């Protein structure tokens, strides 16, 4: 949110644009936790179906975030940088709800791999 307005994600998608999401400092937010940022965005964009929005936000925080920073990362793929977080297991009964459950219930990684190293 900036000036009490949110980015119009429907318009962004309609125009074929990509967006990324991250944290930028405590001067403009109350937390540097990316999961808090994702949760805030999940609540701020009420005009988009929650599961669809959750998937969009995870892509914005991973693949599209890496692309915005010109990093060869952001997805699990041969040749990409192996930056991976391992999180507590979730009891997700419906696999289509995995993205929303991750955003709602994740606090921090249990293990992180940067460049393939713990």
Language model region names:
Residues 2-3:
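Helical hairpin unit composed of two closely spaced alpha helices linked by a short loop
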Residues 82-118:
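C-terminal cap of metal-dependent C-N hydrolases
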Residues 7-89:
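His/Asp/Glu-enriched, well-ordered alpha-helical/loop segment
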């Amino acid at each position: 949110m900036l000036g009490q307005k949110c980015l119009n994600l429907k318009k962004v998608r309609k125009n074929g644009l990509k967006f990324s999401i991250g944290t930028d400092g405590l001067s403009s937010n109350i937390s540097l936790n990316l999961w808090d940022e994702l949760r805030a965005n999940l609540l701020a964009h009420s005009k988009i179906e929650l599961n669809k929005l959750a998937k969009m936000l995870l892509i914005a925080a991973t693949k599209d975030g890496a692309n915005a920073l010109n990093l060869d990362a952001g997805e699990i793929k041969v040749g990409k940088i192996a930056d991976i977080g391992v999180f507590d297991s979730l009891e997700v009964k419906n696999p289509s709800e995995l993205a929303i459950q991750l955003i709602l219930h994740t606090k921090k990684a249990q293990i992180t791999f940067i460049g393939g190293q713990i």
